[in-house]
Amino acid sequence: MSDSNLDGVLVLIPARMASTRLPGKPLADICGLPMIVQVAMRAQEAAIGRVVVAVDDIRVFDAVSAAGFEVVMTSSDHQSGSDRIFEALQKVDPAGKAEFIVNVQGDLPTIDPETVRAALRPLENEAVDIGTLTTEIDNEEDKTAPHIVKVVGSPVSDTRLRGLYFTRATAPYGKGPLYHHIGLYAYRRAALERFVSLGPSTLERREALEQLRALEAGMRIDAEIVDTVPLGVDTPADLEKARRILSARTG
């Protein structure tokens, strides 16, 4: 995305207090700061546009606000991060100035700012509705693991795939690379509006993968190929790993 478009980019970070494996994780301490603040810092370092955190708990609201970041309260009833960021979008940009919405998950405290920027690149092609990220799988166990979502895609360049399907199964069959989907999205505003209006689709329910809703509706998702998968913090062990990574960076 060129610099001329940066005024039209809004980065939204959904944060939810309820977590089965790591309750209250947005406020988990990482190097003296709540995890959600660390994520907001990485998003700000990407320097692609306005950053807003969408929360569902006053404690998270206060922590983000105290750190100097823009924050908006959203419903605790949302079933997905996409629904949460859409509510936030309506509240923080009712005039519709933002043309591109980047959804950065609130549990990625170690994400490289360049990785955030990369999600926007597929939208340079006006035929693309949603940009996302992927990386080649180099671990044999990951190729068959259902928690590793695979992108079945057709190459459109050396660094980009057109997403044809997303699955927890091992796919595609045969020789060649397999790609791990990274759940960071950049939407055209109209695409996000359409996406949330559709409701869950048949394949989305079957695979438990929200992005299939877009594909079933005929929307185009392209995935930029990046070098590494950012650490998602879902367990106490993940949290300790994130602390080690950021401690080493600030060293």
From Swiss-Prot:
- The superkingdom of the source organism is Bacteria
Primary localisation category? cytoplasm
Which gene codes for it? kdsB
Q: Which UniProt keywords apply?
A: Cytoplasm, Lipopolysaccharide biosynthesis, Nucleotidyltransferase, Transferase
Keyword Nucleotidyltransferase among record annotations: yes
Task: Write out the GO MF terms.
Answer: 3-deoxy-manno-octulosonate cytidylyltransferase activity
* InterPro entries, A to Z: Cytidylyl_trans, KdsB, Nucleotide-diphossugar_trans
| Gene3D superfamilies for the chain | Spore Coat Polysaccharide Biosynthesis Protein SpsA, Chain A
Q: Which CDD domains match?
A: CMP-KDO-Synthetase
Name the chain's protein: 3-deoxy-manno-octulosonate cytidylyltransferase
Lineage here is: Bacteria, Pseudomonadati, Pseudomonadota, Alphaproteobacteria, Hyphomicrobiales
- Pathway assigned to this chain's UniProt record: Nucleotide-sugar biosynthesis; CMP-3-deoxy-D-manno-octulosonate biosynthesis; CMP-3-deoxy-D-manno-octulosonate from 3-deoxy-D-manno-octulosonate and CTP: step 1/1; Bacterial outer membrane biogenesis; lipopolysaccharide biosynthesis
Which HAMAP family does its entry note? KdsB
Q: GO cellular component terms?
A: cytosol
Instruction: Write out the catalysed reaction.
Output: 3-deoxy-alpha-D-manno-oct-2-ulosonate + CTP = CMP-3-deoxy-beta-D-manno-octulosonate + diphosphate
- State the organism named in the record: Rhizobium leguminosarum bv. trifolii (strain WSM2304)
Q: Say yes or no: keyword Endoplasmic reticulum present.
A: no
